[in-house]
Regions:
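Aromatic-rich peripheral "rim/lid" segments of glycoside hydrolase catalytic domains that contact
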Residues: 15-32, 36-109
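Active-site neighborhood of phospho(di)ester-bond hydrolases with catalytic His/Asp-centered motifs
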Residues: 4-7
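Active-site environment of divalent metal-dependent phosphoester hydrolases
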Residues: 11-13
Length: 109
């Protein structure tokens, strides 16, 4: 019975909504959660993967609260736009995610 750790997230540094803000605290948190999932999977536990919250991709939030015509981010319309989103420009976070993807792909080979 495999389990997936899902919908964990962490705001951008300083609770900023800007896509140019740093993500150092988020990166540390993701590394921690990924280590728990990866260590459990590597030791034969039930975790098979994880899903972070949430993918903002190429969105460019124009307002703190979503308005008609704004890009959709990983944050739902009723929440602050960009706060928990991982954008395509968040290189350090994407590097953390890639490291976890590579680790999980190698577990069980």
């Amino acid at each position: 019975m495999p389990l997936v750790m899902e919908e964990f997230g962490y705001p951008r540094d300083g609770f900023s909504f800007s896509t140019s803000s740093t993500t150092e605290a988020r990166d540390r948190y993701y590394k921690y959660v990924f280590s728990l999932v990866g260590d459990n999977a590597a030791s034969g536990g039930y975790f098979a993967g994880c899903n972070f919250w949430g993918w903002g991709g190429f969105a460019n939030p124009k307002h703190e609260q979503w308005q008609v015509g704004d890009d959709y981010t990983g944050d739902p319309a009723q929440e602050a736009q960009g706060l928990n989103s991982v954008f395509s420009t968040d290189k350090s976070t994407l590097d953390v995610v890639k490291t976890q993807v590579d680790r999980m792909k190698n577990i069980g080979k």
